[in-house]
Regions:
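Conserved donor NDP-sugar-binding/catalytic core segment of glycosyltransferases
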Residues: 1-35
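A short, conserved alpha-helix in the catalytic core of glycosyltransferases
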Residues: 1-2, 52-54, 58-78, 83-112
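Conserved acidic
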Residues: 6, 90, 150
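Short, flexible, basic/aromatic active-site loop/helix in glycosyltransferases
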Residues: 16, 33-60
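Active-site-adjacent helix/loop segment of glycosyltransferases
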Residues: 19-22, 96-150
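Short glycine/proline- and charge-enriched loop/turn segments
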Residues: 32-33, 50-53, 78, 119-128
Length: 150
């Protein structure tokens, strides 16, 4: 992931391919639909080939589950916006703000992270809570980014 900053000088953030604990593909970077819902590249698609991706692939955002960025950029944009606390869309908003600075968001297809999706929220409440929180924060996100996404 660190090499991406050397190869892609305008890189603002980089993330790895995310896999479920069993090794199946969770996502290879994300796109955004005009309504703010994510497009998790490769998710649920057995024909999707991570090997076919470029080593450093441009994406709309990478998951905060494993995200690397320069400390100076993080401080300059004010870090994660607390309006999204405790979870969901804080990483998406962070990447959008980096993109607004002219920075690229990259997936590095040669790095992998095993991720238990929603593990934190499941421990706090339930899947219903995670869904409600995600939708609440999607609406906040759209209030901020609607014009750009459309």
């Amino acid at each position: 992931m660190l090499k991406c900053f050397e190869i892609q000088p305008d890189c603002g953030a980089v993330g790895p391919v995310l896999r479920w604990p069993a090794g199946t593909l969770q996502e290879a970077g994300c796109g955004l639909q005009p309504d703010g819902y994510p497009i998790r590249h490769g998710r649920g698609d057995p024909s999707f080939s991570v090997k076919a991706l470029k080593r450093y692939q441009l994406v709309d955002y990478v998951s905060g589950a494993c995200l690397m960025m320069r400390r100076t950029d993080f401080l300059e944009i004010g870090g994660f916006d607390p309006i999204y606390s405790p979870a969901y869309y804080e990483d998406t908003d962070l990447c959008m703000r980096l993109r607004g600075m002219g920075k690229a968001i990259c997936l590095t297809s040669r790095a992998e992270c095993y991720h238990i999706e929603n593990a934190t929220s499941h421990g706090v409440e339930s899947a219903e809570w995670a869904t409600r929180q995600s939708e609440k924060n999607r609406l906040i996100f759209m209030g901020k980014w609607d014009k750009i996404l459309k």
